[in-house]
């Protein structure tokens, strides 16, 4: 029985890895072994950062809401507590968008939160 080296399968597998490494710099793009390692590491970073992105955006929204609330003479935590007591159910993403785009509407929400805290 003749020896089978698996040339086409091996080449296809390596070509796939090199294709995934497109855009990397130097040896990480051209050499199979380092490209494979970098593609694996990139996958780990992507997995981690898909979860991290959610945390980062929540932090950003809270920072924006806090800044806008302090412009209206109230802290973030008091604002959120006041909104909860006033039965205003609005998520942080929408609240931060309102704070950026419509200061008047955000001011009204702050006033309702202040009234609910009294």
Curated annotation (Swiss-Prot):
GO MF term (any one): structural constituent of ribosome
Matches recorded under Pfam families: Ribosomal_L20
PROSITE patterns: RIBOSOMAL_L20 (PS00937)
GO cellular component terms listed in the entry, alphabetical order: ribonucleoprotein complex; ribosome
Source taxon at top rank: Bacteria
Swiss-Prot/TrEMBL keywords: Ribonucleoprotein, Ribosomal protein, RNA-binding, rRNA-binding
Classification via InterPro entries: Ribosomal_bL20, RIBOSOMAL_L20_CS, Ribosomal_protein_bL20_C
GO biological process terms held by the UniProt record: ribosomal large subunit assembly; translation
Keyword field contains Ribosomal protein: yes
Database matches in NCBIfam families: rplT_bact (TIGR01032)
Membership in a protein family: Belongs to the bacterial ribosomal protein bL20 family.
Function according to Swiss-Prot or TrEMBL: Binds directly to 23S ribosomal RNA and is necessary for the in vitro assembly process of the 50S ribosomal subunit. It is not involved in the protein synthesizing functions of that subunit.
Record protein name field: Large ribosomal subunit protein bL20
């Amino acid at each position: 029985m003749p020896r089978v080296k698996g040339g086409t399968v091996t080449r296809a597998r390596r070509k796939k890895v090199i294709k995934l490494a497109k855009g990397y710099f130097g040896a990480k793009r051209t050499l199979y072994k380092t490209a494979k390692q970098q593609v694996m590491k990139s996958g780990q970073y992507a997995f981690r950062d898909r979860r991290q992105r959610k945390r980062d955006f929540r932090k950003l929204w809270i920072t924006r809401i806090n800044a806008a609330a302090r412009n209206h003479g109230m802290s973030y935590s008091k604002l959120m507590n006041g909104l909860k007591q006033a039965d205003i159910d609005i998520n942080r993403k929408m609240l931060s968008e309102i704070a950026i785009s419509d200061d008047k509407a955000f001011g009204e929400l702050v006033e309702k939160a202040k009234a609910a805290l009294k």
